[in-house]
């Protein structure tokens, strides 16, 4: 996972959260990572952990919506977000409540930030 961190760090700082989010989505959706690799990814994300977790949340919601949650998505959710895949997917739904543009920030970005903040703060929907 050090190679992932190096590749992301090669981009401008303004793009890194988006890239960490993509790494989280790929890890949780596609699978194929060992527990050690997932732990390493979490550590490597460092200050970008909320963005990584938001990508994981997108994967969990996508798999839930398709009715194909699986063990690797569950494992990644538990390691990165410290919650079950169902709980993480529910956070994406809760973050849609009263969603709108905020001072020129597009609604999609507001949604992403809400997910990041709710996961970082340990917010649950149950």
Where do the protein language model's features map onto the residues?
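Mature, well-folded catalytic/scaffold domains that follow N-terminal targeting or propeptide regions
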Residues: 1-126
């Amino acid at each position: 996972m050090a190679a992932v961190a190096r590749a992301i760090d090669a981009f401008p700082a303004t793009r890194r959260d988006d890239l960490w989010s993509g790494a989280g989505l790929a890890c949780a959706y596609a699978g194929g990572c060992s527990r050690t690799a997932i732990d390493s990814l979490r550590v490597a994300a460092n200050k970008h952990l909320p963005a990584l977790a938001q990508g994981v949340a997108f994967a969990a919601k996508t798999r839930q919506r398709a009715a194909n949650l699986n063990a690797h998505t569950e494992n990644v959710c538990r390691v990165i977000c410290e919650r079950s895949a169902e709980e993480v997917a529910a956070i994406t739904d809760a973050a849609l409540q009263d969603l709108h543009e905020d001072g020129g920030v597009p609604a999609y970005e507001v949604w992403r930030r809400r997910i990041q903040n709710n996961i970082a703060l340990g917010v649950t929907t149950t």
